[in-house]
């Protein structure tokens, strides 16, 4: 069942990516740690929505689709893997050489197992909540910090949830 869920999510991510190849992609990498001190390594691809809402002299609201793979180191030396997909809203501030932005999003993640480090997730499919801050740099580059929380929202017990706090870098192609 877990393998089928992970395969379904992977197929959806690949289908989405294939449907958006005409758009410029951002490839990202992140290194972080969980609240329990285990390391996380994430690689992802994102596609900007190419839309602006609520434009003002302060900035504007926009967003992107994000698909990623994360490796979660475990305290018992057997790590976990996850595939995730999320819509992410960003607010980009105007009038700066390097554009600051904040981001927030809620998506889905499929884990290879329900025990991640010392945390018991209860289910292999979980919600992925994020909040972050970043800077857009020249050459379609971004750097920033991000906090992400994964849990099943109490749908199945136990629901310890897990957080990842990371530094990220992305580059457009």
Label each region the model flagged.
Residues 41-45, 161-173:
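Outer-membrane beta-barrel "beta-signal"
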Residues 43-45, 87-89, 131-133, 167:
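Membrane-embedded beta-strands of outer-membrane beta-barrel proteins
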Residues 30-31, 73-75, 116-119, 152-155:
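Extracellular loop and loop/strand-boundary signature of outer-membrane beta-barrel proteins
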Residues 29-33, 63-71, 102-108, 145-149:
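Transmembrane beta-barrel strands of outer-membrane/channel proteins
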Residues 21-25, 50-61, 94-100, 140:
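Short loop/turn motifs that connect adjacent beta-strands in outer-membrane beta-barrel proteins
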Residues 33, 47-49, 91-93, 135-137, ...:
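Residue-level signature of outer-membrane beta-barrel architecture
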Residues 1-24:
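Cleavable N-terminal export/targeting peptides
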């Amino acid at each position: 069942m877990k393998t089928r869920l992970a395969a379904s999510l992977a197929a959806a991510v690949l289908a989405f990516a294939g449907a958006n190849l005409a758009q410029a992609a951002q490839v990202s990498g992140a290194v972080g740690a969980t609240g329990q001190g285990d390391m996380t390594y994430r690689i992802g691809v994102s596609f900007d929505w190419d839309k602006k809402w609520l434009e003002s002299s302060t900035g504007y609201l926009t967003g992107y689709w994000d698909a990623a793979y994360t490796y979660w180191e475990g305290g018992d030396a057997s790590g976990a893997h996850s595939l995730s997909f999320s819509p992410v809203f960003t607010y980009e501030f105007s009038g700066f050489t390097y554009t600051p932005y904040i981001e927030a999003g809620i998506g889905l993640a499929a884990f290879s197992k329900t025990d991640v480090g010392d945390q018991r997730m209860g289910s292999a499919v979980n919600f992925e909540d994020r909040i972050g801050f970043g800077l857009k740099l020249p050459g379609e580059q971004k750097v920033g910090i991000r906090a992400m929380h994964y849990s099943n929202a109490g749908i199945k017990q136990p629901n310890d949830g897990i957080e990842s706090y990371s530094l990220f870098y992305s580059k457009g192609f």
